[in-house]
Amino acid sequence: MAQNSLRLVEDKSVDKSKALEAALSQIERSFGKGSIMKLGSKDSVIEIETVSTGSLGLDIALGIGGLPKGRIIEIYGPESSGKTTLALQTIAEAQKKGGICGFVDAEHALDPVYARKLGVDLENLLISQPDTGEQALEITDTLVRSGAIDVLVVDSVAALVPRAEIEGEMGDSLPGMQARLMSQALRKLTASISKSNCMVIFINQIRMKIGVMFGSPETTTGGNALKFYASVRLDIRRIGSVKEREEVVGNQTRVKVVKNKMAPPFKQVEFDIMYGEGVSKTGELIDLGVKAGIVEKSGAWFSYNSQRLGQGRENAKLFLRDNPDLLREIEMALRQNAGLIADKFLENGGPESEGDEAADM
């Protein structure tokens, strides 16, 4: 019997560092320079670039100042909760920094007028309305591999219909086909996304599982692959309405960070999404200011540095809207107290909170 050429070297005199250098050089010759390196070396340490979500509170709750580039993001929630609005605000923030963005509209439901109101530059926004799920994911793969895209949104995973389902008869049962499609696509995409430093945001819908006795019956579409590959998962919910007298002018929204590979998860933040405007910056700054102790609240009155902002939240919002310099001053003070505010977000957002079971299923 031939003796195995590979054997464990037990001789203590063998220099381990030389053996390691030989192994590393062999790997680099086979797979190219940079295929393996020490994590702490100057060449390998890369600071994570982020893109703001358009919400200061959510940027703070994410722990790194926004959504990370070169990663997969999932935004999910019920209908009309603000999923597409949040994605479009992220695109608008990326475009302000000169980034190139794309929108794969699988639902064929993007409203360009609303997108423009949120600050999206439509002239420089790439949009595709594919016919099948395979086509949508192939377009996504091509755009990511180009290395020229900063933010790419896929709206939505539920609308990525496999070609076999479209070509088949209405009522045909094709179990697991969409999940297999997503699993294969994410296996291909994940390395390209990291190398190209492109952020890919998947918008997802919620479904109810039948026969669930304990825990939340909610689950997201497209199987479990996206839950594993996503670095950040955001659960967005509408929790109330914003009214001016009797007219509803916006939604009160809660976003929970149910998964975060970049910072501690389970933080949640609340803000207003105003119709035709997007995230209400003034309302959010007032709420965050009160939490951080920067804006004082006495009864119904709000004040900052002994200057009264208004009686009632809506009046204070109007005052700040008319005084942009004061608005910027409060925002700068809040950014300096970001660590304190982040701790406040954990008060109601532990892993035992309602709705987390849906993220774990």
UniProtKB/Swiss-Prot annotation:
Entry superkingdom: Bacteria
Assigned GO CC terms: cytosol
Presence of the UniProt keyword DNA-binding in the record: yes
UniProt entry keywords in alphabetical sequence: ATP-binding, Cytoplasm, DNA damage, DNA recombination, DNA repair, DNA-binding, Nucleotide-binding, SOS response
MF terms in GO: ATP binding; ATP hydrolysis activity; ATP-dependent DNA damage sensor activity; damaged DNA binding; single-stranded DNA binding
Gene Ontology biological process terms from the UniProt entry: DNA recombination; DNA repair; SOS response
Sites where the protein binds ATP: 77-84
Coiled-coil segments: none
Pfam families attached to this UniProt entry: RecA, RecA_C
InterPro entries registered for this protein in UniProt: AAA+_ATPase, DNA_recomb/repair_RecA, DNA_recomb/repair_RecA_CS, P-loop_NTPase, RecA-like_C, RecA-like_N, RecA_ATP-bd, RecA_C_sf
UniProt function note: Can catalyze the hydrolysis of ATP in the presence of single-stranded DNA, the ATP-dependent uptake of single-stranded DNA by duplex DNA, and the ATP-dependent hybridization of homologous single-stranded DNAs. It interacts with LexA causing its activation and leading to its autocatalytic cleavage.
Family the entry assigns: Belongs to the RecA family.
Designated name of the protein: Protein RecA
Natural source organism: Sinorhizobium fredii (strain NBRC 101917 / NGR234)
